[in-house]
A protein has these predicted regions:
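Single conserved hydrophobic/aromatic residue that forms the stacking wall/gate
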Residues: 207-216
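Glycine-rich, highly charged phosphate/nucleotide-binding loops
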Residues: 42-50
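General beta-strand structural signal in soluble alpha/beta enzymes
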Residues: 16, 91-94, 141, 167
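Glycine-rich, flexible N-terminal cofactor/catalytic loop recognition
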Residues: 1-40
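A contiguous loop/helix-start segment that scaffolds small-molecule binding in enzyme catalytic cores
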Residues: 58, 138, 142-208
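A short, charged helix-loop
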Residues: 115-134
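Short active-site oxyanion
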Residues: 8-14, 87-89, 137-139
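Short glycine-cluster motifs
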Residues: 55-115
Length: 216
């Protein structure tokens, strides 16, 4: 957006997930500014120095490679610390894969649950998969292409093969696609294929009537 371009031109510093990717955008729009790498591998070390710059009255833009900073991307800890110190935070809305996948799925969107990437620890992973199987709201997940088949098989085990699902790939990019119907059919579609790109998954709510708890 024109607002985002103006921000990138005028801030003191741009903290970006990958300087090479951000430079492509800057070159396209004729933006010249200072860049530093700020990603999951170095954000813990770099946050204190960025906070110092902010406390000196300087402005910093945080840019991720894809999607929205802080949503399974660097930025959350920096924003939290900056806000606690009274620094003004402005979010420039941009592409958000979770919302795009939810809207394009046609599943109920007035209430939904965002889980991001499931944990690798099996006990935690199984607990969340069980929660997803019983959710009465649409669930949105992120997954890497290398682990998509594993996750689809787990969802089939916990939710059943007939549960409605949509796998969205490369949202907003050239090869964007949305594959959906039920878990069985989506799993069959992807098995045996080379899967590339950013993956976002929408899982429909359970159609079972769950027992309710009354509080007196």
């Amino acid at each position: 957006s024109s607002r985002a371009i103006n921000i990138l031109k005028n801030v003191f510093l741009i903290a970006c997930e990958d300087t090479r990717q951000t430079k492509k955008i800057m070159n396209k729009f004729g933006i010249k500014n200072n860049l530093i790498s700020f990603n999951k591998n170095n954000s813990f070390k770099k946050t204190p120095s960025l906070i110092d710059e902010l406390m000196d009255g300087k402005s910093i833009a945080v840019v991720s490679d894809a999607g929205m900073p802080s949503i399974c991307d660097p930025g959350e800890d920096l924003v939290c610390k900056a806000r606690s110190l009274g620094v003004d935070i402005i979010c420039i809305p941009g592409p958000c894969a979770a919302i795009a996948a939810l809207v394009s799925s046609g599943m109920p969107s007035s209430k939904f649950i965002f889980e991001g990437f499931l944990p690798k620890k099996q006990s935690d992973r199984k607990r969340i998969l069980l929660e997803i199987s019983n959710n009465e709201k649409t669930t949105i997940l992120f997954e890497s292409p290398q682990r998509l088949i594993k996750l689809l098989r787990e969802l089939k085990e916990f939710c059943g093969g007939e549960r409605e699902i949509q796998v969205s790939r490369e949202i907003t990019k050239k090869f964007e696609e949305h594959i959906g119907n039920n878990i069985n059919e989506v799993l069959e579609f992807f098995e045996g294929k080379i899967i590339l790109g950013e993956i976002t998954i929408a899982v429909s709510y359970t159609h079972l009537t769950l027992p309710t708890t009354e509080y007196v």
